[in-house]
Amino acid sequence: MTHNFAENYDIIVVGAGHAGVEASLAASRMGCKTLLATINLEMLAFMPCNPSIGGSAKGIVVREIDALGGEMGKNIDKTYIQMKMLNTGKGPAVRALRAQADKALYAQTMKQTVEKQENLTLRQAMIDEILVEDGKVVGVRTATNQKFSAKSVVITTGTALRGEIILGELKYSSGPNNSLASVTLADNLRDLGLEIGRFKTGTPPRVKASSINYEKTEIQPGDEQPNHFSFMSRDEDYITDQVPCWLTYTNTLSHDIINQNLHRAPMFSGIVKGVGPRYCPSIEDKIVRFADKERHQLFLEPEGRHTEEVYVQGLSTSLPEDVQVDLLRSIKGLENAEMMRTGYAIEYDIVLPHQLRATLETKVIAGLFTAGQTNGTSGYEEAAGQGLVAGINAALKVQGKPELILKRSDAYIGVMIDDLVTKGTLEPYRLLTSRAEYRLILRHDNADMRLTEIGYEIGLVDEERYAIFKKRQMQFENELERLDSIKLKPVSETNKRIQELGFKPLTDALTAKEFMRRPQITYAVATDFVGCADEPLDSKVIELLETEIKYEGYIKKALDQVAKMKRMEEKRIPPHIDWDDIDSIATEARQKFKKINPETLGQASRISGVNPADISILMVYLEGRQKGRKNIN
């Protein structure tokens, strides 16, 4: 078919949420002529739900995005109203940063970045059709019948894909925050042969700040100690004039109001059909599932410095409006609350992610990539991480360069993508630290050490940033070597000073590095005895040193496991293998292999329902094929 294209691009990104922004910025920064098309320009990088970035596991993802050359970390560092390190009382593997965002400023600042980006065109347009010829993407068609050509297309439509808002007895076509839904494109994706699922998510009501009695709530301040998402942000730029959040709780009256109105709750009346998020349930779902609980936490989170809107975290609901008002006013501190926006649920179509490769390219259509909530995930950070990987791989494909696949041992982003393409998901997928088997080496403090080199090689990390990274890397390696070479001896003067600090005296000589392995010995304490490095160390280098030294044994064990798994990850499975040709594998394994078409032996081993015996048989089969080829040659 001949198309009359209005404009020609290398890459077109459909949707400008958190996934679409990262995808389009990555592609354009890698030199590809890119179009970012979105239904509404005012909603670029908009936060339709929580006004925050980061949190458990998610905060580590933001640092990974930053280390690879993405934008989310830089943007939130410019626009936060509160910053807090979570899980400080736990081990380093689960610590993560979380920021309250100035919601409007975050979107506005990101829009300015996109508008100024070279090679990137921003267009308000509804995309109705992905144009495909001979199994390959060739472009898109808009609702106004404009056609644009592209060598790759990235779909990042979020919850707009056949979106429907549900509120009490009401159900109507809509994207998030009452934006337009994308219905024709949803039909088009199904027609192209993609399997489509249906998920649901929700958001809580917003209340007016001046109507809250804060004296009845508990203040939740940010951290005084500087922390940042971007490794390029400076401690001296840390915002100290932070805005607090506030803690309150539901109570028995709140629960009674919900229980008395369950017949009007879409979750229980049958109106909601989509599968909701396990780790972010609605308040009505929590009351029913955890009936023994007398109260549930609610955090009152300001949506910015220049707005009265306050997000009631923990009160996601699709109950009718009148019930929401009664529910709010049953809560301590909210007795006179004015509801500015109602909570609601939203159902939307997703592309079932087992149809994707680890590059996030679809297996059905060459050059078509999907990312974000379109793939069945929840959360801005998960979306941004996928968008970055999809944008990078779309650009690499256009340029004819090797693809980027992040392994489970490389990044939480790699864990997430592997989970999606290998196991699929039956509910909105959320990243958790428990999903990562190598979480001690996937920490927030070493994201730059893990990924900056990759970002530099693909062209997203510039020379200035790379030079700063190399300097930090050298500082870390030199200081580690120095600490391992200096001895502390159990002489009386040294032990006296150690005891004065409240620590146990030395019984044997040991290196400064060994001394730092003691739980209570920080880098600052150690350098009191052995002196400082020749030049002052970056605070991020000191944090990295302390973690790497104290957990050295555990980290080494994790790296040994990675090395063993690497052999399986490097064993490729031919793309057009005939699974019926392999004798003796279990029926369930054969069915799963046919459905997912794993690309490596390692991926095959992680498919649910596949046992070690199946993998052994597959390994023997692959080795036999390889020997057969050698004999033919």
From Swiss-Prot:
It comes from the Bacteria. Its cofactor is FAD. NAD(+) binds at residues 276-290. It is found in: Cytoplasm. One of its GO terms (cellular component) is cytosol. SUPFAM superfamilies: FAD/NAD(P)-binding domain. Its main location: cytoplasm. Keywords: Cytoplasm, FAD, Flavoprotein, NAD, tRNA processing. Homodimer. Heterotetramer of two MnmE and two MnmG subunits. HAMAP family: MnmG_GidA. This is tRNA uridine 5-carboxymethylaminomethyl modification enzyme MnmG. It comes from Streptococcus agalactiae serotype Ia (strain ATCC 27591 / A909 / CDC SS700).
